[in-house]
Regions:
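General beta-strand structural signal in soluble alpha/beta enzymes
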Residues: 6, 31-32, 53-56, 78-79, ...
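Conserved N-terminal alpha-helix of the aminotransferase class I/II PLP-enzyme fold
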Residues: 12-58, 80-81, 85, 91
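Short beta-strands and strand-loop turn motifs
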Residues: 23, 129-138, 165-170
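Conserved core of the PLP fold type I
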Residues: 50-69, 103-104
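Conserved PLP-anchoring active-site segment centered on the Schiff-base-forming lysine
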Residues: 68-86
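PLP-dependent aminotransferase-class I/II
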Residues: 96-156
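Helix C-cap/helix->beta junction micro-motif
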Residues: 160-161
Length: 170
């Protein structure tokens, strides 16, 4: 039986375990781990970026992305069932001191129009909308995926309104 409920349920195969056992290792704190360095270099090259950072979990990756793209008292637009809201222990509120604006998408998928209508006006009494966080595939949406053209429209809304866009690749 193949169990696809979560990546946390799977176990490595004997071949995977052998590859891990045989992999060259070093202290990543001192950037001495050749396996991690090679992975980061390949990912940076793939995305045309000067550098990449390997994180041991999706939750850590999401929390870093939220923190570097927001300031305390900012607002993050996401679906009400988003992993970053439901399953990360309140991390965005604790680590980044931001407020979530929870929208109700179709199986968790937001639209460009929904996002545009949800951006706060410039008002001292309201948090600054700073980040839009999407999830693809949408866990609580039964694995629903975004239409690529909708992502392009969402990115356009974000660019027009000077918002950052984060994609949780759950």
């Amino acid at each position: 039986m193949i169990d696809l409920r979560s990546d946390t349920i799977t176990k490595p195969t004997p071949t995977m375990l052998e590859a891990m056992f045989e992999a060259p290792v070093g202290d990543d704190v001192f950037e001495d781990d050749p396996s991690v360095n090679l992975l980061q270099d390949k990912v940076a090259e793939l995305f045309g970026m000067p550098a990449a950072l390997f994180c041991p979990s999706g939750t850590m990756t999401n929390q870093i992305a939220i923190r570097i793209n927001t300031s305390p008292q900012d607002e993050v637009i996401c679906d009400r069932n988003a992993h970053i809201y439901l399953y990360e222990g309140g991390g965005m509120m604790l680590n980044s001191m931001v407020s979530p604006k929870l929208l109700v998408g179709d199986k968790g998928r937001l639209t460009a129009a929904m996002i545009a209508a949800s951006i706060n006006p410039d008002d001292i009494h309201r948090p600054n909308t700073r980040l839009v966080a999407l999830e693809n595939t949408m866990n609580k949406g039964g694995g629903a995926i975004y239409d690529f053209n909708e992502i392009i429209k969402i990115a356009s809304v974000c660019k027009k309104n000077e918002l950052k866009l984060h994609m949780d690749g759950a």
